[in-house]
Amino acid sequence: MGDEKLSRHTSLKRARSLSESIKGLFKPSGISGSNNAAAPSSRPGQDQAHSHQTARIITSNVSSPSISPVHSPVLQAAPKHHKLGVPNIAKLSLSPSREPSLNSENEMFSQESFISEKDEDEANLLEREDLQNKKEEKARAKHVRSKEAYVPHHRYTGGSDEVERQPRERLKNFPQNAGSSNPANSNANHVLDQENNFSIDAMLDYDEESKLRRRNSLGVRNHSNRTRSRKNSLSTPRSPPMKNGNDGMNSNATNNVGNGTGNRIYMRGRNQSDSISASSLPKFQEIECKCILDLGHFKVFENGYHEHSLRVLPIITNNKNVDSGDEKDADASVNSGDDGDNDSEANMHKQKSVFSLSGLFKSHKDGNQQQQQQQQQEENGEQINLEKAFSIIPSQRFIKSQTVKKSRTSNLKNGNNDELMKNDGKNIPQIVNPNAAVGAEELKLINALSEKIRKGLKSENTKGNNGEGRSNSNKQEDSDDTEGKAGTTNDDTSHKPCSQKYGKYIGVVGAGAYGVVKICARCKTAKDVLPYSTYSNGKKLFFAVKELKPKPGDQIDKFCTRLTSEFIIGHSLSHPHFEANAMIAGNVSRTTPPKHVFNAPNILKILDLMEYSNSFVEVMEFCASGDLYSLLTRNNISNESNNGSSRLIQTVKEGSGSPLHPLEADCFMKQLLNGVQYMHDHGIAHCDLKPENILFQPNGLLKICDFGTSSVFQTAWEKHVHFQSGAMGSEPYVAPEEFIRDAEYDPRLVDCWSCGIVYCTMVMGQYLWKIAIPEKDSLFKSFLSEIKDDGQFYLFEELRHVSSELNRLRKIALYRTFQVDPTKRITIEQLLQSSWMRKTKCCVVYRPLHTKVSK
């Protein structure tokens, strides 16, 4: 009896501690008042009632169907292999009439882990069910000693259906203060303890199984919490904080238990709608990258990237006709004899020296004299009238050209190699290189243009001033040539004059050997879709119009050949090709790329060729920042505002210029090499690369122009590259093998040498030498001797870069580029794959092309 009192006293202390913790975790509820109706008036009785209520809250909740088994506390059942069932170990372990079990620590852990997740309302119902279980245990206590199998009522141990189907009204007939010191319970617990100690192995297995169930239960609960959190909110950390803190969360859990929705006990955060608000999405923190180098036109940031901001030509920014949206103002600039045009014409003449377009025309000794003659012609009204210049390119020629190029490659793919294309009854050889820029359709166009040019020049010489009628007759011939063809319709803009197609004349930007270069501008229309074919200031599109006239004494055939070759090569390179699926023996092209995959960003677009009288007009893409020569020799004296103050740009001596920053020069070099490689892939070598033939857009996009002296080293009917002989281009950029008499050379290697000279000009601000002949140039002679004796050149060794590694890689590439023996010289493709170029960050992202030209 003393032992029973001591055990009861110990249980009361434990009940007080647990009841106090429950009172701190749960708020008082109105329902809880009804649970104390049958409680005794004595203080120990109340504590004992609380102790039993606490035990029931912790252990008996598994019998409630409203609680999900995933979130239920872990029950400490007997090992499965034992033949006797254990009625309720977790519940009996709190009884004062038994000794503490071996797993009491695990029981306390289970109780304290989940006690905060129960509700008082549910506890009242569970208390009544527990009283019913106590009564049933008394009735079955007699059968325990006979070792009859006891089947527990709850579902985890295969409970009886009769117990679970009993009406809830019968719970009222059972006393709520049933003591735990019942002799039947004491005997049952004694037998249970004896059976639990039946085997040490069984107890160890039971202990491990209990830990595993607890660990799995916690894992499933955490996983379900994360799943619910993702369903109700995009992410828990991103949800706005709750006003009531944890109180709101606990109240939600309490309400969910009371409503029988146990699956929502572990909700975190507030409920949200199915739609996601933009305010709940994570905001991208735009970190402004620090600029570590600012040269005005070139900026370098700390992440290694750079930005070009080249200055737009003053003829665009300062011209009133450009800013004005009235076409009458632009039209007034055409008639130079008007009184209101004197100031505009004077302004244009002052701006001519800003943009060097000598690359568009070959330099000659009488350039200044011809420019004066052109100005005199403009003053006398003898300049080409753009309103009477019409295109001599048949509108259906290029539509048919696209179809022929498509069929050309399809015939190769289908094995129709024996089919020969015919042109006006003449057989054309078999196509073996569909990637070539010059093919059957280009050949037909060359023949047609040559015939028209010759006819126009001869008729002008014989008829005198009847050029206007001849131009109109050509227009009628082109119209008759395209009419009546099946599946073709006349384009609305094909026979419009130059002023209607490309706008009004606004000024002159340069002069050359065969004429001048003017700028035309027109307002944008709905048909102009991005990307534009030329420069735009947002309101208007600008076009460069190159006027070509034969010089006195020039042969017609020579002028005709230059004009047609320049236009055909430029037009073919600057427009998309359609031979995409060609499969050639030993040379696999690409596999179904987009049709415009061949369109190169570094090739100046040639748009149209027009004619008026004995003059011709080539319409091109306009580059608003001028050429590389103008960039290197930018303005001898100029004032630029810098935060309200003016700074004077250093005066540049004649023959030298301001070198570019190494990173800027590297970017331009990479663009130049990609453009030249694109030409080589299509069987064309430029043969006259120099700063005057390299144009720029304000964002730093490089454009290669002037294809008048370009060499077609491989056509569509040639399998191998054919060499050429004779010096071509400007002397400072000509390779040494070109000066060898009667010697043939590879034009692709000549372009590589010229690219190296152009790069050295960018970083040095001057030429390496005037001519690559040792007898005529002492600097080139010293270069040869130093390379032969020391294996290095002092100018290359004095070059500096932003890092020693880049400087070392650049020197290696330069020495390989300036190999006097062309057989040892690096190619453009190899130079692009060098470590120097791979480490160079370029503004243009290039799609890798795998087209190759047969060697």
From Swiss-Prot:
Key word Translocase present: no
Enzyme class per UniProt: transferase
Composition skew (Polar residues), residue ranges: 31-45, 94-114, 462-474
The species this protein was found in: Saccharomyces cerevisiae (strain YJM789) (Baker's yeast)
Record-linked Pfam families: Pkinase
Name of this protein: Serine/threonine-protein kinase HAL5
Gene (UniProt): HAL5
Role description: Protein kinase involved in salt tolerance and pH sensitivity, probably by regulating plasma membrane potential and cation influx. Positively controls the TRK1-TRK2 potassium transport system in response to potassium starvation. Stabilizes TRK1 in the plasma membrane by preventing its vacuolar sorting and degradation. Also stabilizes other plasma membrane nutrient transporters like CAN1, FUR4 and HXT1. May itself be subject to regulation by ARL1.
Protein kinase domain boundaries: 503-837
Superkingdom in the source lineage: Eukaryota
KW Phosphoprotein (keyword) present: yes
UniProt feature, compositional bias: Basic and acidic residues: 125-139
